[in-house]
């Protein structure tokens, strides 16, 4: 999980969200990363991850660094986008992971000004893929939660 500096919008357009997904895809194949759920908001992202190679810091440095470089280049800006490195909490792959996924998927409707009325309507979340309303992205690992 990471939030932007000062609530700044870091996903201002569909192209920004897609660029982040492209970087996640690259990280999955390059570092063996497994993404069990995701939800991107305009100023933050949430990702329950598994790093079988024990390389979480390297993976997150890659994701945050590459996205920041691309964002700054496209928007002719400079400086950090995100507060600090990232926030990580160890979660066991059982009911706790399922509950975390539910909390993450609830983000777009649980905020003060909901972005959508129903989880399924939010395109920047893995929820539509879980309920077969959207095709899962090639790098997305939904097996762990489906078997929980």
Walk through the language-model features, giving the residues of each.
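A generic structural motif
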Residues: 45-49
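Short Pro-Cys-Gly-centered "Cys-loop" motif that presents a nucleophilic cysteine in a tight turn
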Residues: 1-38, 50-148
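Short Gly/Ser/Thr- and Asp/Glu-enriched loop/turn motifs at secondary-structure junctions
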Residues: 40-44
